[in-house]
Amino acid sequence: MAGIRDIIVVGDRVLIRPEEESDQTSHGLYLPAGVRSKEKVQGGTIMKVGPGYPVPNPAYMDGEPWSTEDREMVKYVPLQAQPGDYALFLREKAIEIEYQGEKLLIIPQSSLLVLVRKDPLEELQE
């Protein structure tokens, strides 16, 4: 059975697993259905990222047609987001999909507000 690793994210988009939404506030009050969906900002864990922003490859235009060096038409400027980061993003820009029974969101990098990344060296020092 295919998993998330089989999904290919294109362009400047990221695939996010949203955090679980609670129907209860921190004070114990239960919220009516739909209240959480009206919030402007949501958080989640980044599962996959696209290759980045496409830019023209000058070597493709300037090179000789028979040359075998770097013949890709475009290059990609990589994204800041990395798999495993926690992200806060604009909910209105998210596209919700369901893949194998799991709710996922596809979001452009420009809609990410904050990234939280754990320092891998910090874990080694503990």
Label every PLM stretch briefly.
Residues 2-126:
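Compact, glycine-rich, soluble single-domain proteins
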